[in-house]
């Protein structure tokens, strides 16, 4: 079983890379977020999950052990296979997933193509007691910023306002989280202005 590969990226496709390790090219599937951080000709270390089936052997690569752990965790949910797990990780980081599950936020998962209401509910229900066992740093974020419990900045109302201004719900929630972590006492007006300013600046 292959657990790690270190080598140069020879080629990259829509959902995979070919990594050259001592002259041998391995085809490795990866999430969109991981692929976006890789460049052809550069050297990387990838954590590998090997899936052996009767008809094939597939390798799945991750830049962090946390992403690999969540790839496996997501597949423990009924209805999620390797392709759907990668799709979710292409849209959400492990920390995003942990925060969403802790906050029972099904909408973040429903926004992902192929994830319906029932599957989103299963993700939250089936992983609620499991995500705490995987360290991502989300516990620190969640202690200081629980979307459902912050009344001082009325975060849910701000998220709705940002969605009305053209943000996706995921973009709005991430923006609110980042701003409030840095300034917990920020007013609603300033929060909205800062979110818009950050978006226009590409932050």
From Swiss-Prot:
Q: Where is this region: Domain III?
A: 150-203
- Residues of the region (Flexible linker) are 143-149
Q: Which Gene3D superfamilies match?
A: 5' to 3' exonuclease, C-terminal subdomain (1.10.150.20), DNA helicase RuvA subunit, C-terminal domain (1.10.8.10), Nucleic acid-binding proteins (2.40.50.140)
- Spell out the residue ranges making up region: Domain I: 1-63
Q: Name one GO molecular function term.
A: ATP binding
Q: What is its main location?
A: cytoplasm
Q: Name one GO biological process term.
A: DNA repair
Q: Does the keyword Iron-sulfur apply?
A: no
Could you tell me where this protein is found in the cell? Cytoplasm
Entry keyword Cytoplasm: yes
Q: Which keywords label this protein? A: Cytoplasm, DNA damage, DNA recombination, DNA repair, DNA-binding
Identify the stretch(es) annotated as Domain II: 64-142
* Gene Ontology, cellular component aspect: cytoplasm; Holliday junction helicase complex; Holliday junction resolvase complex
Quaternary assembly: Homotetramer. Forms an RuvA(8)-RuvB(12)-Holliday junction (HJ) complex. HJ DNA is sandwiched between 2 RuvA tetramers; dsDNA enters through RuvA and exits via RuvB. An RuvB hexamer assembles on each DNA strand where it exits the tetramer. Each RuvB hexamer is contacted by two RuvA subunits (via domain III) on 2 adjacent RuvB subunits; this complex drives branch migration. In the full resolvosome a probable DNA-RuvA(4)-RuvB(12)-RuvC(2) complex forms which resolves the HJ.
Primary role: The RuvA-RuvB-RuvC complex processes Holliday junction (HJ) DNA during genetic recombination and DNA repair, while the RuvA-RuvB complex plays an important role in the rescue of blocked DNA replication forks via replication fork reversal (RFR). RuvA specifically binds to HJ cruciform DNA, conferring on it an open structure. The RuvB hexamer acts as an ATP-dependent pump, pulling dsDNA into and through the RuvAB complex. HJ branch migration allows RuvC to scan DNA until it finds its consensus sequence, where it cleaves and resolves the cruciform DNA.
Say which family it is in.
Belongs to the RuvA family.
Tell what the record comments on domains. Answer: Has three domains with a flexible linker between the domains II and III and assumes an 'L' shape. Domain III is highly mobile and contacts RuvB.
Q: What is this protein called?
A: Holliday junction branch migration complex subunit RuvA
Q: Which gene encodes it?
A: ruvA
């Amino acid at each position: 079983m292959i657990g790690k590969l270190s080598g140069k990226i020879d080629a990259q496709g829509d959902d995979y890379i070919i990594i050259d390790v001592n002259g041998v090219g391995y085809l490795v599937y990866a999430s969109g977020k991981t692929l976006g951080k890789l460049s052809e000709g550069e050297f990387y270390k990838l954590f590998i999950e090997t899936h052996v089936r009767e008809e094939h052997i597939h390798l799945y690569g991750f830049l962090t052990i946390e992403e690999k752990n969540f790839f496996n965790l997501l597949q423990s949910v009924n209805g999620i296979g390797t392709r759907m797990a990668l799709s979710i990780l292409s849209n959400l980081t492990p920390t995003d997933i942990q925060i969403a599950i802790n906050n029972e936020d099904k909408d973040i998962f429903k926004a992902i193509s192929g994830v319906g209401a029932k599957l989103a509910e299963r993700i939250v229900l089936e992983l609620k007691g499991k995500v705490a066992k995987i360290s991502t740093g989300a516990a620190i974020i969640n202690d200081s910023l629980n979307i459902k419990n912050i009344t001082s900045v009325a975060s849910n109302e701000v998220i709705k306002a940002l969605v009305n201004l053209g943000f996706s719900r995921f973009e709005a929630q991430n923006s609110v989280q980042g701003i409030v972590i840095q300034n917990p006492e920020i007013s609603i007006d300033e929060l909205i202005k800062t979110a818009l300013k950050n978006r226009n600046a590409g932050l």
